[in-house]
């Protein structure tokens, strides 16, 4: 059994994708993160992995060959146990001690310097642009799966896992936060890579605020909080055949970004609004956001 070569050290946490363990590779001395998932038995002779899982893992392996600096390393994949119904697969990732949530919490008041935020955003967008260029939609970006190394390198984690984990998640329902979800996801409409850019906008604002931007407790409540900032979108932008009609929300106009992120200068506020654009077809892409002037000019120092 391949995972026996790793010595468990501690349980890191439990998330949408099951329990994550910190372990040590005795051969190299390096720490790794172990994520186990149950997938349905493929039903092939010998009960192999389902084709969909093999395909998803192959995609993660292919991405690994690029060694993108802002994407967490996948070191190994091993099938560890099986029953008649399912197979337990363990994904072995490089281990990084802190996520963006911890990193933000550790920053002394008044929070991160603007130049640090810009550097984090450039790295974050670079990793995301790489995933999108390879047709991977993350679907669950939040501060907890954006990792930050001790030298300030940003690495995206938990991408490409949504389909691998669909079977296990159906078996073990979990409460997934709505706070970083794009409107089209909240409305149960079709979605693609722009959903991630909405999440980026929420996280960008949170780097300044040090608290989440939209904290809804249901899909409708979350949408209401979004419209309190960006205004109720025009009828033409409302997707067809979705879970909630536009008429369910009272008309309201947009508020200035500085009313919720007062520390953000005008150019940053403009970039944020391009990320928090209701219509996904009009939302800025990771590639275009990387070119935005805000991320490339030095902050004017008032002192």
From Swiss-Prot:
Q: What is its main location?
A: cytoplasm
Show the InterPro entries listed in the entry.
CDK, Kinase-like_dom_sf, Prot_kinase_dom, Protein_kinase_ATP_BS, Ser/Thr_kinase_AS
The organs and tissues expressing this protein are described as: Expressed in fetal and adult lung. Also expressed in brain, heart, liver, skeletal muscle and testes.
Q: What keywords would UniProt list here?
A: Acetylation, ATP-binding, Cell cycle, Cell division, Cytoplasm, Kinase, Membrane, Nucleotide-binding, Nucleus, Phosphoprotein, Proto-oncogene, Serine/threonine-protein kinase, Transferase
Q: Protein name, please?
A: Cyclin-dependent kinase 4
- Gene Ontology cellular-component annotations: bicellular tight junction; chromatin; cyclin D1-CDK4 complex; cyclin D2-CDK4 complex; cyclin D3-CDK4 complex; cyclin-dependent protein kinase holoenzyme complex; cytoplasm; cytosol
Active site residues per record: 140 (proton acceptor)
Q: Which Pfam families match?
A: Pkinase
